[in-house]
Amino acid sequence: MHPRTVVYLEHDGKLLLVDESGNGPKDCIMGRNTNEVWLRFPTLEEVEYLGITWTAGRETDLRFGNETYTVLHGEPEIDWPEHWTWKDKVVSDNAVHPVAREAVYRSLHRLVSKVIIRNDKNEILMAKVERGFFKGYWGLPGGYMNH
């Protein structure tokens, strides 16, 4: 049975996921198609056991049928979570519990650029992504945002 309250820890586009026994961090596999759910967000106790300190943010209640789950959003106080999974991988791996997939989906920003910087040659300022899921791709300057 999935825990009623879980913790959504995100750092630079990476998320902490655990297996059904609370062991982690675990990675997602994009496009995985299985009938078994193996991965989920950790509980408060599991985050504490992993020795991760974090700053609490907002809470989100998600309803699935007659069940309500509380997702506690927070920012981990760590450097780079190298072994955590990429946020972008979570939504396409159905071994991830629907609570985690829905929480990630709701956290995705639909941004519209209001400003584009052009030079005298009418060229647009672009930035090449240096790390992360979109490493090597070009886009408008920016980065991951929390809300």
Kindly give the residue locations of the regions a language model identified:
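Hydrophobic transmembrane signal anchors and adjacent membrane-proximal interface regions, especially
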Residues: 9, 37-39, 49, 62, ...
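Conserved Nudix-box catalytic region and its N-terminal flanking loop in Nudix hydrolases
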Residues: 11-50, 123-147
